[in-house]
Amino acid sequence: MPRCISRELKTLSVWVLTLTISGCIGTGGIAPQGEALSPNQLATDEAIREAARDAHWPSRQWWKAYGDPQLDRWIEQAVQDSPSLAMAAARVRQARAMAGVAEAAESVQINGEATLKRHNWPTDQFYGPGELANTTTWDNNAGLGLSYALDLWGRERNASEQAVDLARVSVAEARQAQLELQNNIVRAYIQFSLHYAQRDIVAATLRQQEQILELAQKRLDGGIGTHFEVSQAQAPLPETHRQLDALDEAIALSRNQLAALAGKGPGDGAGLQRPTLALGTPLKLPSALPAELLGQRPDVVAGRWQVAAQARGIDVARAGFYPNVDLVGSLGYMATGGGALEFLTGKKLTYNVGPAISLPIFDGGRLRSQLGEAAAGYDIAVAHYNQTLVTALKSISDQLIRRESMDKQQVFAAESVAAAQRTYDIAMVAFQRGLTDYLNVLNAQSLLFKQQQVQQQVEAARLSAHADLVTALGGGLEAGNDTADLSHAPWRGSLLPLDCAAVPSGGCCAPKREQAPSPRC
């Protein structure tokens, strides 16, 4: 047999033996079990279907619907100065940097090294006698080392894609933090406004009580009243003053809360003036399709990217079962003896190049455990994503039901205040004419006070319901894109799913670098 053929057969035998041995470590029986929901699998209720008429998304700066310039400025400052958003932004930068580290592993790695040193060569059992025995010479070298992962099984590529997907998760989480901050500021601002409205009611009640006391005193002085009536008129005054003081405290605390939410000190909050909130046309929805309702929510987007990242993790773990082949080489100069720079001459040139192969054979089950962990991580991400979808659609329905209820309650509350006001006016006229005692006036006044408080609470709840609904929808669209077309959504093209490059064994779409998992996942 020719020598060259024999050599090739030996090489082939080595490869066959290697692959046979590697079969001792297999991926059999390990696969993810989770299956992600499609949003359209979730049925919508009557509240969502009713709201889907004359559809228009809120604008990106949705809080401007309240028509309060002070609120607009405060939210803009909060987005710039909030420590919580600064942390979220730092996490985004950190994740992007980690993605850069992972992507670098796909590139050629080149390192330079140089050593200049004096070397004493002894005569002993290691060196032995020779030309360099008992001499001191230069022992120098300089060169470039090169390595490149051929990535035959996609390990490095999938690790890089996974890091990019995790970076996108951090972006979506940062958007979620921003949306929650905006919602918290709006809700705190609404409570700030409510305290002012409640104070107006209490202050008006105090003026009424003082007028009644003055009238009771005049009736007593005129001989048609009693000391008991005067005492009755005086009794509620201290409590009303206490309520005024409590509301002043609540207003001051609201200022502090708004300042803290914006990342500012109490001194900045002290400059806040009374809110002027007025909500216009109710918010409509783009359609009754859950995929469109949920597509903007940052937590849903983050969940999808997390599923994509875990799918990449499975591919990374699976690639570990196959041989790893790197191309390595070096080019440089080296010399022992001669002058200090003699090693830089052409005749001292040295180089090497070739593949470096590593193959797992026996590892005590480590690789199978890693694959099992990745598959379980995928199942966890899918389950979390499914729960996020269910919770998100429930939240939208809850806020729509709440908003509709608040609109109805607002009408009833206004009617109750009007009726209580008429009752109080009649009681006051009767008391002034001596046709009734003070107790009827007090009861009528208490009823009016209660109904006015309820009316303001309902109005505050209606304003809060709007903010909560916008938050449940994931915020608004950019100005000028106030349509039902979600292709203009702020996450579209950078975070929302488009299409899939491949479908791994886990059953979920593995997206391309610039894409997220398919809505089918």
Can you describe what each PLM-predicted range is?
Residues 2-80, 127, 140, 164, ...:
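Terminal intrinsically disordered/low-complexity segments used for targeting and assembly
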Residues 3, 12, 487-498, 507-511, ...:
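Short, low-complexity intrinsically disordered segments enriched in A/P/G/S/L with frequent Arg
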Residues 25, 156, 165, 172-289, ...:
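Periplasmic alpha-helical coiled-coil/stalk elements that build and connect Gram-negative outer-membrane
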Residues 25-184, 325, 329, 361-371, ...:
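Short flexible linkers and secondary-structure junctions
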Residues 75, 141-145, 189, 234, ...:
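Membrane-embedded beta-strand positions in outer-membrane beta-barrel channels/transporters
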Residues 86-87, 103, 150-178, 228, ...:
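Sec/SRP-type N-terminal targeting helices
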Residues 145-147, 316, 356, 474:
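Outer-membrane beta-barrel architecture
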Residues 220-224, 431-435, 472-476:
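A short glycine-centered flexible hinge/capping loop motif at secondary-structure junctions
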